[in-house]
C-alpha cells in the first residue's frame, strides 16, 4: 500500500508542471498591444518570450519584440513608454529609477548566463593585460562588472573595445580582432561547436551570478493595465512550464530565431539553460538577482546612493498570475 501511494505521488509531481502549463487563462479586457524590449538581438534566453508572443498573437493579442543595440536604450525606451515591458539585466533599470523613472521588477527570466572566453594562449585573467577585450556596452551590467573585476581583482588594464551583440564578439574573436570577451552561454556553446579546442572559458568565480535577466514594466502602463500585465505574465509562466515539462517544444523556436546555432547543439543548449543557468523559473523565481546585483555594485562603489530593492519590485502582478495558474510544487 505504501509503495502504491508513493507511486501515485510520483506520478502527481511529474504531471504537475504539464497540467499547470495547460491551465486556460481568460483573455483580459483592455488594450492587448504589448511591445517587449530586448537589450540585443534575440538570444536563447529570449526564446520562451518569443514562443509566448507567437501563441498570444494567434489568440488576438498584438505582442511585438523590439531589439535594441544597447542595454541602456532598451531601458530608456521602457522609461519613456515607447515599450511597455523589457527583458533586462539589473543595472540599467536601477540607474533609470535613480534618475526618476517609474519602472518595476516583475519576475525573473534567468540566472547568471555569461562566461568570459579567450584564445587558448591566454591562460587566466592576468594574461589579458594590454590585450583587446570586447564588451557589449559601457552601461551593460555584465560589461561594467567585468571591467571592475579585471581592474580590482586581476589588477590589469586591458584594451577595452565595445562590440554590441554576442554573435558579433564571437566573429571578432574568430577573426583575431580581439583576444578575449564575455558572451552568453548559448554563444559559447555555439562557438565551441564550430571551433572545438581553439578557445576556452576563463574562470571568474561567482562574478557572473549577477548577470541574470528579469522582466521590468513601465509603471504608468502597469497602473492602467494591471490585468493585461497579470495575464501576460501568467502566459509567460505557462511557456516556462511547457519548456520544463518537455524541452523539445522550444527547439523549433530556437532553430527559427537563432539560425546560426548548429542544429545538433540546440537540445544540449536548452538543457544547459534549464540546469546550469536555472532559466525560466516555473513560479517566477525570486528577487535574489536584483538584491545581489545592487549589493555588488554598492560594495564596489559604482552605486553612490543607497538602493532599497524592495521599492523596485511590484509583487502583485506575479502573485496574481500564480493565483490564476497555481504553483508548481518544489519549483522556483
Regions found by a protein language model. Give the residues of each.
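Short, low-complexity disordered leader/linker segments with a strong preference
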Residues: 1-33, 326-332
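Proline/Glycine/Serine-rich low-complexity intrinsically disordered segments
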Residues: 121-123, 223, 282
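Short, glycine-/small- and polar/acidic-enriched structural segments
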Residues: 21-165, 172, 179-185, 201-209
